[in-house]
Amino acid sequence: AIAAGVILLWMGAAVRRLITEKGRRGRIVYRFVLTVVCTVLTVYAGFSLLWGVNYYAESFQEQSGVYARESTPEELARVTEYFARQLAGCADQVQRDENGLFAESRADIFAHSVRVFDGIYDEFPCLVMEDRVPKGVRFSTALSAMDFTGFYFPFTGEANLNIDSPACYLPSTIAHEMAHQRGIASEQECNFIAIAASTTAQSPAYRYSGWLMGFTYLSNALYRADQEAWKQVRVLLPDTVVADLRDNSAYWA
């Protein structure tokens, strides 16, 4: 916000000089364009140094030895069913409102974030680092308009989260952005890490959100592969989980 304010003030000053210093307009425009170009190049260079290099670094698969492979529809159905049963089993462990929707405090979710990776450090020591509490974005409705649930900002090293969207996915999304803080560039790898961390966390909210995120991706893939198998798995979900899924779909529609 401060940076945006500085840019607006600088642009306002440039416009004012164009109006008041008519004899020097050419020089003012030249300096304005030069400053913009230099600023863009500096930001690009900073982004490349602070984040872009991660696209060429050793991937999480290479660091961990866990590699993705193609699965059969039968394997996909079995794993999706497993996630559905785990999700159903922890659905009543989280706070809910009068409509049966996930109602855990966002403040508590953020507070518990610094311990979410503890359960997978032994298995994945490449992820060990000291965590900081991520930040909720004040203008989250703007993020929603752009279909963003969160983002990692490499210039500050902060994980920034949308706090306007349904909270049931907030814990696992926090874990996803915290995976980016560990230098993991791949979105799919960050999803895997987020699900692994969340489902083994001490916090019921994180466990539920982790199983929910995993089920969502698996269920979508199963629907594309075998709709009959998808229907058999879908009926395993309790009404509370279905309510969360529908609420999330309605929000993003």
Model features per residue range: what roles?
Residues 186-214:
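Post-HEXXH active-site segment of zinc metalloproteases
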Residues 1-18:
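Membrane-embedded alpha-helical segments of integral membrane proteins
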Residues 94-167:
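Auxiliary, metal-adjacent structural segments of Zn-dependent hydrolase domains
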Residues 239-253:
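Pan-zinc metallopeptidase signature
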Residues 52-119:
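Membrane-interface segments at or immediately adjacent to transmembrane helices
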Residues 17-30:
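Membrane-interfacial, low-structure loops and terminal tails that flank and connect transmembrane helices
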Residues 27-54:
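Internal/C-terminal transmembrane anchor helices
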Residues 170-196:
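Active-site recognition of the HExxH zinc-binding catalytic motif
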